[in-house]
Amino acid sequence: MEVALLSFSSSLSPLCHQRISTLTPKTSNSPNYPRLPVIRSAVSRNKKEETVEAVKSHLENCHLLAAINYKGLTVKQFQDLRRTLPDTTKLIVAKNTLVFKAIEGTKWEALKPCMKGMNAWLFVQTDEIPSAIKPYRSFQKERKLENNDFAGAVFEGKFYAPDNFKVLETMPTRAEVYAKMLGALQSPAINLVTTLQAPAREVIMVLMAYIKKLEDESNA
């Protein structure tokens, strides 16, 4: 935001000079350029609000939100990292307090244990979690950034600590889930019972795939 400073001609009357001096705060360091704390605080507040709204926007189609310890990373390393990530992920740096303000009261609030230290935030906007995480793991290994590990993540409302990341990194792909459950539906009844004990989301996914398969066969 630019602030215009107006100058006045010496031909102004003493009364005008008196009025101007009453409106201009005097400072010992810069008598001609008064400080503008109100404007600065307003700009700072606007930037914070923009950050909170940006986080909320990234969360709209988000499947996983992870915190990465970026302390010690150079600007170039951070830029290189961003270039390695797929289009389905977003990586930003934001203060913990602002991120928490955006996630407070939502399922993402489970990420609260990560609200300390210096974090970059990875928004995964696809349900193919392993393929979204892998680029960072590869970058971390290549650059020997052992200290810049995941601090934690939230997936489907559940918090995953660094020790539990193996679960996220080895999740089956959508195609693998379809193949496994379609095979179970076509197998003896005992396997079907086992299939129906799977999480509801997976059951719905496979049933939809099975219906599509039947439709394709009938249209053939």
Curated annotation (Swiss-Prot):
The keyword Transcription regulation does not apply. Pfam families: Ribosomal_L10. It is found in: Plastid, Chloroplast. Its main location: plastid. GO terms for cellular component: chloroplast; chloroplast envelope; chloroplast stroma; cytosolic ribosome; plastid; ribonucleoprotein complex. GO terms for molecular function: rRNA binding. This is Large ribosomal subunit protein uL10c. It comes from Arabidopsis thaliana (Mouse-ear cress). The lineage of its organism: Eukaryota, Viridiplantae, Streptophyta, Embryophyta, Tracheophyta. The gene is RPL10.
